[in-house]
């Protein structure tokens, strides 16, 4: 029997895929495909985006961007986080390849993305030293907060807080507001 070698996906291969409404990413050569998000996902994402925009207006430490995006983390990984804050030194970049310094990455979990967001991509974000990663679970009404060296998440159930080292003030958001 002839064995076929598994495909190792590259960022270039992912960029060449058709724009068909699916989200395509690759992490260490594994292709991740997720369908369009649910309404709840988008509602939570909008509330979080609004709160972060207000915070970044007060604390101009970087720029908030959303997917679709092509964020390369290493030669074999291309991700599209739901929301991410780019450090001020990369703010204003005109090409995705120019974005190298992320302060915050946010994934709002969907049933189809839980494994990728909570294990595969979380480990990737940690290994690349992204200071803070939020896995937002609208169904459980919690946010897992991960940092690069953490073995376990801090699970926020009431209030989400974020204080980048370059910021003078604290970001705070009541989870009852986020999940209203």
Task: Tell where the protein language model's regions lie, with residue ranges.
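Gly/Pro/Ser/Thr-rich low-complexity, intrinsically disordered segments predominantly at protein N-termini
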Residues: 1-180
